[in-house]
Amino acid sequence: MSRRHRTFPVKVGSVTIGGTAPVTIQSMTNTDTKDTEKTLAQIKDLVEAGCQLVRVAIPDEESVNSFKTLTQFSPVPLIADIHFSYQLAIKAIEAGASKIRINPGNIGSRQRVAKVVEKAKTHNVPIRVGINSGSVEKNLLQKYGGPTPSALVESAVNNVMMLSEMGFGDVVVSIKASDVNTTVKANQEFATRLPNPLHLGITEAGTIKQGTIKSSVGIGTLLSHGIGDTLRVSLSGSPIEEVSVARGILSSLNLAEGPRIVSCPTCARSNISVEDLASTVEDRLKDLNTSLTVAVMGCEVNGPGEAKEADIGIAGSKEYGVLFKKGKIIDRVPKNQLLEVLSRAIDEYIDEIHSK
């Protein structure tokens, strides 16, 4: 892990993005915003899953009315996602948005952007400048021959500078493409240019499987180089899955508390059903906010030997299963009791941690 790139902090309601604040997890509702009850229920589900900021699309006036109610009852700050209409951006701020996401390039004239900025200033609402490969200005596409990393960066810098000229500095930036390499290179380049907090993501990443792979590689690469202050994993599926993947990315880089499951790929030596046991353990621990490494190994060659760094683990043998802690065997039990014994040992270990 590289030392974290220095950015300035931006307050989004009660949550800070950038500076020395931890990397935060965002997601976006996929309900009809006008359905206030269903959207609020999804917001609460996202928060329960570990989401700290939730973005809501505001496509029309009726959605603004619903959004106002949502801001009053949401347990976390809400971000209004705006495209094309500067009037909707202004109304979303008035409705209680803690941040707005715009692409100044599709809001309209400089005068219209200035009206949004003035309203944001009045309400102390930060702006995220969202630059996507599909919405880069035509002159930059011609200059660079397409949505290259340099084209994306120049678009982002130009928009940040425009807001700065209007006296507005609370700007978070996102530079996203569906191509992982383009996204990584663009964010790396931007990080050398300006100190604005960076929102990471791979846009239109795809299905849960494909999107998880692309997001983990792209976002993980940037975070491992110290770049990034908040993230959203974009998946064609439930936003709850987005939060789960985001938590996994942060946990795997030791940037957030959470469980890690270590399991062997299995071979002819396996004496237990590693896949089933590991999947069950993973599901049981998915909401845990404690750093804990649990190993599920097929034989005593892999566990506890190769999994000795795990806090708690199990391994199979021909006649029984073993339970180990920090590489030392602490119990031998019938294999059909391994899951029960492991679950109890995990609970006891967590209690030990919390009692210290």
From Swiss-Prot:
Pathway it acts in?
Isoprenoid biosynthesis; isopentenyl diphosphate biosynthesis via DXP pathway; isopentenyl diphosphate from 1-deoxy-D-xylulose 5-phosphate: step 5/6
Xref: Pfam families: GcpE
Cofactor(s) it depends on: [4Fe-4S] cluster
For molecular function, the Gene Ontology terms on record are:
4 iron, 4 sulfur cluster binding; 4-hydroxy-3-methylbut-2-en-1-yl diphosphate synthase activity (ferredoxin); 4-hydroxy-3-methylbut-2-enyl-diphosphate synthase activity (flavodoxin); iron ion binding
- Free-text comment on the cofactor: Binds 1 [4Fe-4S] cluster.
| Alphabetical keyword list | 4Fe-4S, Iron, Iron-sulfur, Isoprene biosynthesis, Metal-binding, Oxidoreductase
InterPro entries assigned: Dihydropteroate_synth-like_sf, IspG_bac, IspG_bac-typ, NO2/SO3_Rdtase_4Fe4S_sf
What is the reaction catalyzed?
(2E)-4-hydroxy-3-methylbut-2-enyl diphosphate + oxidized [flavodoxin] + H2O + 2 H(+) = 2-C-methyl-D-erythritol 2,4-cyclic diphosphate + reduced [flavodoxin]
Say yes or no: keyword Glycoprotein present. no
Q: Which domain of life is it from?
A: Bacteria
Where does the chain bind [4Fe-4S] cluster? C264, C267, C299, E306
GO process terms (BP): isopentenyl diphosphate biosynthetic process, methylerythritol 4-phosphate pathway; terpenoid biosynthetic process
Enzyme Commission designation: 1.17.7.3
Family membership noted in the UniProt record: Belongs to the IspG family.
Q: What does this protein do?
A: Converts 2C-methyl-D-erythritol 2,4-cyclodiphosphate (ME-2,4cPP) into 1-hydroxy-2-methyl-2-(E)-butenyl 4-diphosphate.
Name of the protein: 4-hydroxy-3-methylbut-2-en-1-yl diphosphate synthase (flavodoxin)
Taxonomic source organism: Natranaerobius thermophilus (strain ATCC BAA-1301 / DSM 18059 / JW/NM-WN-LF)
Question: Which gene is annotated as encoding this protein in its UniProt record?
Answer: ispG
